[in-house]
Structure formats: structure tokens, C-alpha cells
Amino acid sequence: MEPAHVPVLAQEAVAALAIKPEGVYVDATFGRGGHSRMILARLGTLGRLVALDRDPAAIAAGAALDDPRLTLRQSEFSRLGKVLDALGIARVDGILLDIGVSSPQLDDAARGFSFRFDAPLDMRMDPGSGISAADWLATAEEEEISEVIRTYGEERFAKPIARALVAARQKEAITSTAQLAGIIAAAVKKREPGQHPATRSFQAIRIYLNRELEELKAVLPQCVERLRAGGRLAVISFHSLEDRIVKRFLRTESLGEQAPPRLPIPAAMLKAGRLRLVGRAQHASDAEVAANPRARSAVLRVAERVAEAGA
């Protein structure tokens, strides 16, 4: 197996799960198993861990763990409920989500996620499904490219970037990461200090092609449904769009059903919140950011499932 990669906020996230030795847990974003190893180290012989990842390379690497308490499944985490049903698991004691692309994916030039390497332009978390970045850029309309880069990358130069990409592909196909980064860099007239001009666009295309925000929106309600009372949900996000979705969802689920303004509905008739927020949002320490600059934008949010009335 590859050398163990320590995920961002790993200690904080696993500690937040308050692991019970005989509990059942889900690592919905296995990656290279950093979180899973830490969870397994805290589980007893009767404990169980279900780990998911849509990347076949992650599942192949995870097979080397060879732990009878670990069940690995190649799947998008939006299918969490179906995976648990297939395993005969109704409720779990904790779920961990580490959103976004993993460091091994970024560091593997062949995957085409990063402009740090000149490689074929792919960006798919599961190379066996969906459309590659090269194929999408070859056919997408200029307006669509602009909208994707603006929406998912929060890039203010989305329009000139899209215009430059469409003009460039008319001369030759955009098939490599270096080629894409160069076109974007030439189109961005004003650069952010300390950031490559292609950063936001690469991020936007990756998020769009892998439907990352849709996946997140789909899995969060399933997490609440599958947690037993007292079970914990820990979510690590690296992008403001992701964190916004997580923050709003957890807040809504903690508040419960709200009566319309000036409508006298008794509180007993309203559905209570299903979650209790646990502490404040956590960020990586200065020491962790110094050791791993990717930790700078990481945010950890934790919530606990509340027992339903009458349960």
C-alpha cells in the first residue's frame, strides 16, 4: 500500500466521532485510508467500519489493510443509504465526510487534476465514468464554460477565460493540464497574490464534472437518517461553496421545523430538530498549515443525532 497520508484535521475529526469500541462507523471518503486507520485503531474486535470511495485506485489501495472489521465499497457517497441497505445495516454510530479531491489524486500527474504537472486533462474521480475535462472543453458552449467557472470557482474573470478557451480550441484541441493552465493564465490580466491564475478555474471544472456539490447535497440527509441517537456526523470541507452547504444544512436540522411568522402554531405541533450542533467550526492549526498548506481552507463541522420524541 502507498505510504500513509495523514488527512487534514484528522485527529480532530476522528475525536469528534466519540468512537465506541463496539460501534458501527462510516468513512464515506476513504481516500488512502488515513481516517479509516485511525477509526479502526479505536474500534474493538466487534466494531465495524464501512468505507466508501468512488475512485477505484482508493479501493485498490484500501484492500491492503486486510482488516475483517473493514468493509470497502466503490461508490459515490450519495449512494450511502443503498450501500448500507445492501450490507444489512440500518443505523450507524458515526459518519465522516472529507469533501473534495484527495492529496493522492492531486499528486498523481496522470489523473489530470493539477496544473503542477503536464498531463492528460481528465479530472474525473472515477476515470471509468462520466466525461473528461478535455472532452467537456471540446464541446461545451462558451456561455456554459463561463457559468461553470464563475459558479464553482467564484472566478471574476470567468467570461474572458471562457472566451479564450473557445478561441484556443478552434486552433487545436485542449488536451493537457499545462495547455489549459497556459490559456487561462494568458486570459487573466490581474492576478491574486500567491495564487496561480488557473487555480479557481481548475477547481471549478473539477467540481462541476464530478458533481461534487450535488453529491454533498444528496448525502447529508441520508447521514441524518442513518445515524442512531447520539451518533455523530463530522464533515471536513475545503471550499466555501461546500462549507456553506454543510453549515446551512446542519443549522436547519438543528433548528427543526419553524412556524411561519405571526402564525400561532404550538411548539408541540412542530417537528423538533434532528441534530445538535457540537462545538464551533474548527480550523487547522498554524502548525498543520505550515506542514501542509492545503489545510489552510479546511473547516470541520460536527453534529450529533438527537433522539426522536417518543423513541
From Swiss-Prot:
Keywords: Cytoplasm, Methyltransferase, rRNA processing, S-adenosyl-L-methionine, Transferase. Pfam families: Methyltransf_5 (PF01795). The keyword Ubl conjugation does not apply. GO terms for cellular component: cytoplasm. It is found in: Cytoplasm. Its EC number is 2.1.1.199. GO terms for molecular function: rRNA (cytosine-N4-)-methyltransferase activity. GO terms for biological process: rRNA base methylation. It catalyses: cytidine(1402) in 16S rRNA + S-adenosyl-L-methionine = N(4)-methylcytidine(1402) in 16S rRNA + S-adenosyl-L-homocysteine + H(+). Specifically methylates the N4 position of cytidine in position 1402 (C1402) of 16S rRNA. Belongs to the methyltransferase superfamily. RsmH family. This is Ribosomal RNA small subunit methyltransferase H. It comes from Thiobacillus denitrificans (strain ATCC 25259 / T1). The gene is rsmH.
